[in-house]
């Protein structure tokens, strides 16, 4: 079930972000993700509209929107491949006719996921936190 996040969800949201980041971004030193947790809270989550996917009381994933910027979409690693990410992205697309996000170039599964859902690569930028290249991806409803 999709629902808007509540303040009491925040610790579990950060846990999902950390676990999924460590798995999906293994090309980045793990200490980077551990150190970035507070920045995640203050830079994105405190300023974003967040939806969570919940099943039987457990949060399986979340997505965060800041205007038309998809700041985060993360699913617990042990729950990936079951439609959770698809449902979260559908929610974002239902709220914004146009979406922008950034995806690490090395994160090929995520690049494929977004391209399958209609996103196009618009350019590359260097991530200030890690120094790794990210694709700027864009979605426009037709």
State what each model feature region is.
Residues 81-94, 112-116:
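Conserved acetyl-CoA-binding loop-helix of GNAT-fold acetyltransferases
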Residues 115-124:
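Conserved acetyl-CoA-binding loop of GNAT-fold acetyltransferases
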Residues 1-15:
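A short beta-loop-alpha structural element at the N-terminal edge
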Residues 48-61:
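Conserved beta-hairpin
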Residues 69-80, 103-104:
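A short, internal acetyl-CoA/4′-phosphopantetheine-binding micro-motif in the GNAT/acyltransferase core
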Residues 85, 89, 106-110, 127-133:
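Short glycine/proline-centered loop/turn elements that form peptide/ligand docking sites
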Residues 94-106:
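Conserved GNAT acetyl-CoA-binding A-motif
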Residues 14-41:
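Conserved GNAT-fold acetyl-CoA-binding loop/helix
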